[in-house]
């Protein structure tokens, strides 16, 4: 499942998915695969993204990741 709300948040904060991937320390392939729903996120991935995207409200986490 593609994550359109997640992609929007990434673009709003980092301007490109590539810049977000660089900031989080992921390969370009992993970043695009996660954002496009081709790779499942681990709990660690979600935790890293929440920190970088300033997400701390459970409702917002639900919108971004589930």
Regions picked out by a protein language model, each given a short descriptive name:
Residues 60-66:
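Short amphipathic recognition helices of helix-turn-helix/homeodomain-type DNA-binding modules
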Residues 22, 33, 51:
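Alpha-helical residues within the helix-turn-helix
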Residues 44-60:
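DNA major-groove recognition helix of helix-turn-helix/homeodomain DNA-binding modules
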Residues 15-16, 41-44:
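Residue-level signal for the short linker/turn that defines the boundary of a DNA-recognition helix
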Residues 1-15, 19, 23:
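A short, Lys/Arg-rich alpha-helix, primarily the initiator
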Residues 25-41:
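Recognition helix of helix-turn-helix/homeodomain-like DNA-binding domains
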